[in-house]
Amino acid sequence: MSELSAARELDEIAHTASEGWMIAGLIGGAIVGAALIAVTGGTAAVAVAAVVAGASAGGGLGEVLGSMSWAPRHVTGVLADGSPNVYINGRPAIRAHISTGECSEDGPAKKVVAQGSAKVYINDFPAARINDLLACSAEIHTGSPNVIIGGEKEQTDDIEPEIPDWVNWTLLAAGAGAAAVLATPAIAILGTLGGLGGGFAGSLIGGAFFGEGSDGQKWSMLAGGFVGGFAGGKGGAKFDAWRNTKIVEPPPRVTTKVDPISPPRMTLAEAVGQEQAKVWTQTARANAEKNNAQLSTLLTDDQIGAIYGYTTNEGYTALNPALRGQTPLTPELEAFTGHVTDGLNKLPAYNGETYRGTTLPAHILEQNQIGGTVSDGGFMSTSAKTPFDGDVSISVRGNSGKQIDFLSKYKNEAEVLYPPNTRFEVINRIEQNGTTHLLYREIP
């Protein structure tokens, strides 16, 4: 688990050296390519290709090296819009998704803080720390000298890469084209694919061993790219040798069977009907804007409408029996469930004990013994205030529940909803005055 200095208003933000080192690599690589041609000679096409290949390789290498932790950073602004009521060292604390940074490198508009702690929340949003990123890829450069916040990184907003994707794809295409001129198309294609595959594999291995975003991961990616590119180039050379000696006969005509493409998930309107979806979405959006406008912005129309629809009698009485295998789980109900689950995943976790009142079949109640593990195939509704009616009273301690009363049809229920198949350990069981009292603790 990462432990990093807490971020506050006016703490500095900085960009890496990726852009500057990429430009330096482009220039340096082009010079090296030109020098090689000057020494060895070559046609005009070969000379141009050598310069392009050198520039592409140098630019890509410079971009990666510039992002290393030891590469210099340059300060581009400060953090702003901290918490109105939580202070660290006398300065407002910074929260992901709400707080911003004033970055001189990315125009006059403020950039939202896009990462924070997955364990520590301030005003219901992840607490930001040093090294967390803003939406423009600037990182928080300075922080509190004595307040440390733990937890892995949680991303709340999209992050634009420091080097746009089109630039990297252009470098890749230019390098592959230059390789085709300098060598052969087969060597260029297989070498490029080998480099991409090796780099991807190296990134996965390095991320697992050294951590995501670490220098070790980046070195592993570079090494994998070089090894994969070399192996692919050798494979291309062998292919060229085989092609030049093989007698090629016209292939027989064959009929290729094309598997149908799986259709995308239904919209909420397709799943429950256009009018029903419209009513749910409009009502939920109005409730959310009134009760918690910030959370409202996290959800799409299909997600907010589906969560609201679940809270109605028509919603949960249709979904839960199907999820528990008691009624058919139709494609429409699968889509409905997917939109509810996607929406819950975007909401902050509820911290605290919740309660549930219910009536369980005898064979299910019998499974609820101390030390046992239980789960519900459907969504599990609990309340942050008082349990619902029933001869079984359950107290729940977990961290996967999401409070949805800000959009619910029944706000007074203070509903906290757990996703299907959440696993709990039965910590205690007491029989008292005809009521069974159970204590659940979520299993991570």
From Swiss-Prot:
Function, in words: Toxic component of a contact-dependent interbacterial competition system (also called effector-immunity systems). Acts by ADP-ribosylating a number of target proteins in target cells; E.coli target proteins include FtsZ, EFTu, RNase E, Fis, RL9, SucB, and LolD. FtsZ is thought to be the physiologically relevant target as it is ADP-ribosylated on a critical residue. ADP-ribosylation of FtsZ prevents formation of the FtsZ mid-cell ring and inhibits cell division. Overexpression of the whole Tre1 protein or the ART domain in E.coli is toxic; cells elongate dramatically and some undergo lysis.
Transmembrane segments: none
Gene that specifies this protein: tre1
Annotated stretches, region: ART domain: 274-444
GO molecular function: NAD+ poly-ADP-ribosyltransferase activity; NAD+-protein-arginine ADP-ribosyltransferase activity; nucleotidyltransferase activity; toxin activity
Knockout or disruption consequences: A double tre1-tri1 deletion is outcompeted by wild-type cells, but not by wild-type cells missing a type 6 secretion system (T6SS).
PANTHER family (alphabetical): ADP-RIBOSYLTRANSFERASE, SECRETED EXOENZYME S
Source organism: Serratia proteamaculans (strain 568)
Enzyme Commission designation: 2.4.2.31
Description of its domains: The ART domain is toxic when expressed as a protein fragment.
Name of the protein in its database record: NAD(+)--protein-arginine ADP-ribosyltransferase Tre1
Catalyzed reactions: L-arginyl-[protein] + NAD(+) = N(omega)-(ADP-D-ribosyl)-L-arginyl-[protein] + nicotinamide + H(+)
Region (PAAR domain): 72-140
Subcellular location per the Swiss-Prot or TrEMBL entry: Secreted; Host cytoplasm
Description of how the protein assembles with itself and partners: Forms a stable complex with cognate immunity protein Tri1-Sp.
